[in-house]
Design a protein with these regions (language model features):
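N-terminal amphipathic/basic leader segments beginning at the initiator methionine
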Residues: 2-39
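Mg2+-dependent prenyl diphosphate-binding active-site environment of isoprenoid biosynthetic enzymes
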Residues: 39-128
C-alpha cells in the first residue's frame, strides 16, 4: 500500500535534494518503513523477518542503490519511482549477501555474526 501510494505521487522528476547522501537516506527510510513498520504490522513473530531486520540494521556501502539512483537521474525518472527502484536494487543485493554467506560458510558479515550463524541456515535461506 505504501509503495503504491508513493508511486502514485510520483509525477515530478524534480530532484529536491542537496547531495546523493540525502537520497540514500530517503532510500533507507523507505526500506525501514517497509520492514520495520509495514511488515511488523502483519507479522511480529516471523523469524525470517527478524533475520532480515537483523541484516538490514548493519548497512553496507549501498553501491548498487547509488548506481541505480545515478542511472535514474540520467534517465529523468520521477523522484519517487527512483526511490522505489533504488530500494529494490539494494534489497535484492542484501538478499544475495545472505545467500552468499550461507553458500560460502562465512560466519561474519559487517563485523557481526552472519544471518545464518545467528538464526540458522534454514531461516537465512528463507530470509534471503
Amino acid at each position: 500500500m505504501f509503495i503504491q501510494t508513493l508511486a502514485r505521487q510520483s509525477t515530478s522528476s524534480m530532484y529536491a535534494f542537496s547531495s546523493p547522501d540525502d537520497v540514500i537516506q530517503e532510500v533507507n527510510s523507505l526500506i525501514h518503513h517497509i520492514f520495520f513498520e509495514q511488515v511488523n504490522a502483519v507479522s511480529k513473530t516471523n523469524l525470517s523477518i527478524e533475520a532480515i531486520k537483523y541484516h538490514l540494521l548493519s548497512p553496507g556501502q549501498q553501491f548498487r542503490a547509488k548506481v541505480c539512483l545515478d542511472a535514474c537521474m540520467k534517465l529523468d525518472v520521477a523522484y519517487n519511482d527512483m526511490l522505489i527502484l533504488a530500494a529494490a536494487a539494494e534489497l535484492l543485493h542484501e538478499a544475495s549477501l545472505i545467500h552468499d554467506d550461507v553458500q560460502d560458510g562465512d560466519e561474519i558479515r559487517r563485523n557481526q555474526p552472519a544471518v545464518w550463524k545467528k538464526f540458522g541456515k534454514n531461516i537465512a535461506i528463507c530470509a534471503g
